Amino acid sequence: MTTQNELLNRIAELETKVAFQDNVIEELNQVLIHHQFVLDKLQTQVRHFANKFKNIQSSNVASQAEETPPPHY
């Protein structure tokens, strides 16, 4: 009987561990979903700022015809 009780205790312990691990996996999944959402948002912002930077750069650069010659000419 001791062996059977030991086995039942081990099974109960394993069931407890599995339940705990299921809970941890679910929590980690929620954190991962949140991080993916934040990452997507940051990537969108980086693309937006990169485009904005390109537009600012191209609008501030004058063509060679528009440039005034240096003072030594």
Swiss-Prot record:
Listed PANTHER family: PROTEIN SLYX
HAMAP family reported for this sequence: SlyX
Stored NCBIfam families: PRK02119.1 (NF002556)
Family designation: Belongs to the SlyX family.
Protein name (database record): Protein SlyX homolog
Native source organism of the sequence: Haemophilus ducreyi (strain 35000HP / ATCC 700724)
